[in-house]
Amino acid sequence: MKSIVKIYLFLFLFSCKNGFDNTYDGSQVIEVKNQIDSNIVKIINPYKINLDKEMNKIISYTTSDLEKGKPEGKLGNFICDLSLIKAEGKADICVFNNGGLRDIISKGNITISDIFQVMPFENELVIIELDKKEYYTLLKYITDRGGEPFSGTEIIKENDTILSDFNNYKKIRVLTSDYLANGGDNMDFFIGKNQNKLGIKLRDAIIEYCEQKDTLKINLDNRLVFKNE
Protein backbone atom coordinates (compact mmCIF):
# COMPACT_ATOMS: atom_id res chain seq x y z
CA MET A 1 0.00 0.00 0.00
CA LYS A 2 2.93 2.37 0.65
CA SER A 3 4.03 2.05 -2.97
CA ILE A 4 0.53 2.95 -4.16
CA VAL A 5 0.55 6.10 -2.05
CA LYS A 6 3.98 7.17 -3.35
CA ILE A 7 3.01 6.62 -6.99
CA TYR A 8 -0.31 8.36 -6.42
CA LEU A 9 1.43 11.46 -5.06
CA PHE A 10 4.05 11.43 -7.81
CA LEU A 11 1.46 11.26 -10.56
CA PHE A 12 -0.59 13.95 -8.90
CA LEU A 13 2.34 16.34 -9.25
CA PHE A 14 2.83 15.46 -12.92
CA SER A 15 -0.71 14.67 -14.01
CA CYS A 16 -1.12 17.43 -16.62
CA LYS A 17 0.93 17.86 -19.78
CA ASN A 18 0.29 21.57 -19.81
CA GLY A 19 -0.70 23.88 -17.05
CA PHE A 20 -0.71 27.50 -16.00
CA ASP A 21 -0.32 28.68 -12.41
CA ASN A 22 -1.18 32.21 -11.43
CA THR A 23 1.14 33.45 -8.71
CA TYR A 24 0.42 36.64 -6.77
CA ASP A 25 3.47 38.54 -5.53
CA GLY A 26 1.61 41.40 -3.81
CA SER A 27 1.48 43.77 -6.77
CA GLN A 28 0.80 41.82 -9.91
CA VAL A 29 -0.27 38.42 -11.14
CA ILE A 30 2.60 36.44 -12.61
CA GLU A 31 1.75 33.70 -15.07
CA VAL A 32 3.99 30.67 -14.76
CA LYS A 33 3.90 28.06 -17.51
CA ASN A 34 4.57 24.47 -16.53
CA GLN A 35 5.08 22.07 -19.44
CA ILE A 36 6.10 18.50 -18.92
CA ASP A 37 8.55 17.03 -21.42
CA SER A 38 7.04 14.33 -23.64
CA ASN A 39 9.76 11.92 -22.51
CA ILE A 40 8.61 12.31 -18.91
CA VAL A 41 5.03 11.66 -20.00
CA LYS A 42 6.17 8.43 -21.68
CA ILE A 43 7.89 7.39 -18.46
CA ILE A 44 4.99 8.05 -16.11
CA ASN A 45 2.16 6.80 -18.34
CA PRO A 46 2.77 3.08 -17.60
CA TYR A 47 2.74 3.87 -13.87
CA LYS A 48 -0.47 5.83 -14.27
CA ILE A 49 -2.13 2.97 -16.13
CA ASN A 50 -1.14 0.50 -13.41
CA LEU A 51 -2.18 2.91 -10.69
CA ASP A 52 -5.58 3.51 -12.27
CA LYS A 53 -6.08 -0.24 -12.49
CA GLU A 54 -5.21 -0.68 -8.82
CA MET A 55 -7.26 2.28 -7.62
CA ASN A 56 -10.33 1.11 -9.56
CA LYS A 57 -10.12 -2.40 -8.14
CA ILE A 58 -13.44 -3.46 -6.58
CA ILE A 59 -12.88 -4.65 -3.01
CA SER A 60 -16.42 -4.91 -1.62
CA TYR A 61 -20.07 -3.92 -2.06
CA THR A 62 -22.33 -1.83 0.18
CA THR A 63 -26.10 -2.28 0.25
CA SER A 64 -26.66 1.38 1.17
CA ASP A 65 -25.00 4.79 1.06
CA LEU A 66 -22.48 5.25 3.88
CA GLU A 67 -22.61 8.86 5.04
CA LYS A 68 -21.66 10.94 8.04
CA GLY A 69 -24.40 11.91 10.45
CA LYS A 70 -25.44 13.06 13.91
CA PRO A 71 -26.06 11.66 16.44
CA GLU A 72 -24.65 8.78 14.38
CA GLY A 73 -23.98 7.94 10.75
CA LYS A 74 -23.42 4.74 8.85
CA LEU A 75 -19.97 5.81 7.67
CA GLY A 76 -18.74 6.61 11.16
CA ASN A 77 -20.26 3.43 12.61
CA PHE A 78 -18.63 1.35 9.88
CA ILE A 79 -15.13 2.78 10.29
CA CYS A 80 -15.18 2.73 14.10
CA ASP A 81 -16.50 -0.83 14.25
CA LEU A 82 -13.91 -2.23 11.83
CA SER A 83 -11.10 -0.36 13.58
CA LEU A 84 -12.10 -1.82 16.94
CA ILE A 85 -12.06 -5.29 15.37
CA LYS A 86 -8.60 -4.52 14.00
CA ALA A 87 -7.41 -3.71 17.54
CA GLU A 88 -8.03 -7.36 18.48
CA GLY A 89 -9.19 -6.73 22.04
CA LYS A 90 -6.51 -4.19 22.91
CA ALA A 91 -9.06 -1.33 23.13
CA ASP A 92 -12.42 -0.90 24.85
CA ILE A 93 -13.88 1.79 22.60
CA CYS A 94 -13.03 3.59 19.37
CA VAL A 95 -13.48 7.31 18.70
CA PHE A 96 -12.90 9.35 15.56
CA ASN A 97 -14.33 12.64 14.26
CA ASN A 98 -16.73 13.45 11.44
CA GLY A 99 -14.33 16.09 10.14
CA GLY A 100 -11.76 13.44 9.28
CA LEU A 101 -14.15 11.57 6.99
CA ARG A 102 -13.82 13.45 3.72
CA ASP A 103 -16.39 11.78 1.47
CA ILE A 104 -19.26 9.30 1.38
CA ILE A 105 -19.25 5.73 0.08
CA SER A 106 -22.16 5.40 -2.33
CA LYS A 107 -24.33 2.30 -2.55
CA GLY A 108 -22.82 -0.29 -4.86
CA ASN A 109 -19.30 -1.46 -5.58
CA ILE A 110 -16.51 -0.09 -3.38
CA THR A 111 -13.11 0.59 -4.95
CA ILE A 112 -9.75 1.41 -3.41
CA SER A 113 -10.18 4.90 -4.84
CA ASP A 114 -13.38 5.30 -2.81
CA ILE A 115 -11.45 4.61 0.39
CA PHE A 116 -8.75 7.14 -0.55
CA GLN A 117 -11.50 9.72 -1.06
CA VAL A 118 -12.93 9.03 2.40
CA MET A 119 -9.56 8.86 4.13
CA PRO A 120 -6.86 10.78 2.21
CA PHE A 121 -4.69 11.24 5.32
CA GLU A 122 -1.83 9.08 6.57
CA ASN A 123 -3.44 8.69 9.99
CA GLU A 124 -2.22 5.81 12.13
CA LEU A 125 -4.26 3.85 14.67
CA VAL A 126 -3.19 4.34 18.29
CA ILE A 127 -4.55 3.37 21.70
CA ILE A 128 -4.65 5.76 24.64
CA GLU A 129 -5.58 4.92 28.22
CA LEU A 130 -7.87 7.38 30.03
CA ASP A 131 -8.90 7.50 33.68
CA LYS A 132 -12.55 7.90 34.74
CA LYS A 133 -12.46 11.70 34.77
CA GLU A 134 -10.76 11.93 31.38
CA TYR A 135 -13.19 9.39 29.96
CA TYR A 136 -16.16 11.42 31.14
CA THR A 137 -14.63 14.46 29.42
CA LEU A 138 -14.53 12.38 26.23
CA LEU A 139 -18.19 11.42 26.63
CA LYS A 140 -19.10 15.06 27.19
CA TYR A 141 -17.13 16.03 24.09
CA ILE A 142 -19.14 13.57 21.99
CA THR A 143 -22.53 14.59 23.37
CA ASP A 144 -21.83 18.34 23.36
CA ARG A 145 -21.14 18.08 19.62
CA GLY A 146 -24.35 16.20 18.99
CA GLY A 147 -22.43 13.04 18.18
CA GLU A 148 -19.08 11.97 16.75
CA PRO A 149 -18.13 8.53 15.36
CA PHE A 150 -17.54 5.94 18.11
CA SER A 151 -18.04 2.26 18.84
CA GLY A 152 -17.64 -0.26 21.64
CA THR A 153 -20.33 1.16 23.90
CA GLU A 154 -23.73 2.80 24.01
CA ILE A 155 -23.96 6.36 25.28
CA ILE A 156 -27.11 7.77 26.86
CA LYS A 157 -27.37 11.44 27.79
CA GLU A 158 -30.28 12.39 30.01
CA ASN A 159 -30.30 15.95 31.30
CA ASP A 160 -26.85 16.42 32.90
CA THR A 161 -26.08 12.70 33.21
CA ILE A 162 -24.05 10.76 30.64
CA LEU A 163 -24.07 6.97 30.91
CA SER A 164 -21.98 4.35 29.10
CA ASP A 165 -20.78 0.79 29.66
CA PHE A 166 -17.44 1.95 31.06
CA ASN A 167 -18.41 4.71 33.49
CA ASN A 168 -17.24 2.70 36.50
CA TYR A 169 -13.98 1.49 34.98
CA LYS A 170 -10.79 2.92 36.49
CA LYS A 171 -9.03 2.83 33.12
CA ILE A 172 -10.56 2.89 29.65
CA ARG A 173 -8.54 2.03 26.54
CA VAL A 174 -9.50 4.29 23.64
CA LEU A 175 -8.62 3.54 20.03
CA THR A 176 -8.25 6.63 17.84
CA SER A 177 -5.98 8.20 15.21
CA ASP A 178 -2.59 9.74 15.94
CA TYR A 179 -3.95 13.09 14.71
CA LEU A 180 -6.72 13.12 17.32
CA ALA A 181 -4.39 11.62 19.94
CA ASN A 182 -2.24 14.72 19.59
CA GLY A 183 -5.19 16.99 20.34
CA GLY A 184 -6.64 17.40 16.87
CA ASP A 185 -10.21 18.75 16.58
CA ASN A 186 -9.98 20.04 20.17
CA MET A 187 -9.59 16.59 21.73
CA ASP A 188 -7.38 18.09 24.42
CA PHE A 189 -8.04 15.23 26.86
CA PHE A 190 -5.66 13.06 24.80
CA ILE A 191 -2.72 15.47 24.87
CA GLY A 192 0.34 14.20 26.73
CA LYS A 193 -0.95 10.64 27.10
CA ASN A 194 1.15 7.64 26.12
CA GLN A 195 0.27 6.33 22.66
CA ASN A 196 0.33 2.63 21.90
CA LYS A 197 0.77 2.54 18.12
CA LEU A 198 -0.74 -0.44 16.31
CA GLY A 199 1.49 0.05 13.27
CA ILE A 200 -1.34 0.32 10.75
CA LYS A 201 -2.80 3.27 8.88
CA LEU A 202 -6.53 3.82 9.28
CA ARG A 203 -7.00 3.82 5.51
CA ASP A 204 -5.18 0.48 5.19
CA ALA A 205 -7.38 -0.99 7.93
CA ILE A 206 -10.49 0.05 6.00
CA ILE A 207 -9.18 -1.43 2.74
CA GLU A 208 -8.16 -4.71 4.38
CA TYR A 209 -11.54 -5.06 6.06
CA CYS A 210 -13.41 -4.41 2.80
CA GLU A 211 -11.26 -6.97 1.00
CA GLN A 212 -12.36 -9.57 3.56
CA LYS A 213 -16.08 -8.76 3.23
CA ASP A 214 -17.96 -9.45 0.01
CA THR A 215 -20.98 -7.36 1.05
CA LEU A 216 -21.38 -4.64 3.69
CA LYS A 217 -24.72 -4.19 5.43
CA ILE A 218 -24.20 -1.23 7.75
CA ASN A 219 -27.02 -0.07 10.02
CA LEU A 220 -27.79 2.70 12.47
CA ASP A 221 -28.20 1.14 15.93
CA ASN A 222 -29.00 4.01 18.32
CA ARG A 223 -25.58 3.83 19.96
CA LEU A 224 -26.00 7.47 21.03
CA VAL A 225 -29.32 8.46 22.60
CA PHE A 226 -30.40 11.85 23.91
CA LYS A 227 -33.29 11.66 26.40
CA ASN A 228 -35.50 14.53 27.52
CA GLU A 229 -33.87 16.92 25.06
Regions found by a protein language model. Give the residues of each.
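Sec-dependent signal peptide recognition
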Residues: K2-F10
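Post-signal peptide N-terminal segment of mature Sec-exported envelope proteins
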Residues: Y24-N45
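C-terminal motif of bacterial Sec signal peptides marking the signal peptidase cleavage site
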Residues: F14-S15
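A conserved active-site cap/scaffold subdomain adjacent to cofactor or substrate pockets
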Residues: K68, G73-K74
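Acidic/histidine-rich, surface-exposed loop or edge segments in extracytoplasmic proteins
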Residues: E54-E67, D185-F190
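Feature captures C-terminal
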Residues: G19-I30, N77-C80, L84-I93, N97-E229
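Post-signal-peptide N-terminal segment of Sec-exported extracytoplasmic proteins
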Residues: S38-Y61
